[in-house]
Every structure is written in structure tokens, then in C-alpha cells.
């Protein structure tokens, strides 16, 4: 399969998932369900002016899914430092509570312990603003982010908790 064919299939799948009634989502495999809900929530958020407005456009359970998935994507892509540096200002204050709501208590404790130990105010991440790659490196060296990241990577993926959460609340997605 060439790249163009793959991308066309992916676009068709995304279109299908956006139009699919919530009740039909339950028939999808776990992987497809997770992808479908990711597409659906991101589509709602992306249609808004900014992340704050996008979060407000989601219902409570969609917001939980979006915020926890956002954390996992950022940490898996570049670590907790990247999560704080990127546009997580609206999401970071929600993460701890939402981790608990999906049953990810080990990850919740890791997150809470890290921000408490290093006095990180998740309601004001302006100290994490960066302009360059050098700024990112400086941020990365402020705290022992590898300590958090290494522990996080050894835990059950948040996707597993989120998929279960979606199945339990399928009508909200």
C-alpha cells in the first residue's frame, strides 16, 4: 500500500467516525473506538477559536477524555516538560482530577507528587513559556522530568483506562 492510498483510507475512516451515531461506536474494536473518539473530540476542539473555548464545547466526559489523552500524547512525544511547555494551560489544572475519574490512580499520584514536590502551579504555567529550542532545553533542566517520564512509561497506558471509560459512557461520545 502506498502512502497516498493509506492517507485516503485514513481520511475515509475519519469521515465515517465523525458521522457515526454514538450507539454504533460500541461495535468498534478498542483501537478503532479510541481512534474514533479521539477524532470526534479533536474535531470539536479544533473547530473553536482556542483551547479554552474548545474544552467548553465538549461535554464533561468528552473533556475528561480529551484532557487525559492530551497528557498522554504530550508525555509520550516529549515528556512532562513538553506537556507544560505546549498549549496545556487549560488542560493541566484538570489532569489530576480526571486521572482519578478514569481510575488511573497510580498516574494521578505520580502527577500530583511531582507538581507538589517541585512547587509547580498548574494554574499558572507562564514560567514554562519558550521562544526557542534552547529555551525548551533550559526548561527541561529546571526539574528532573526524566524521573517522572521514566515512571510514567512503566505504567499502564492511559489509553487503556480511557477506552474502558468510553465504553462505560458510550452515549456521551
Region roles according to the model:
Residues 3-66, 72-77, 81-92, 98-173:
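Extended, alpha-helix-rich binding/interface surfaces that flank or overlap catalytic cores
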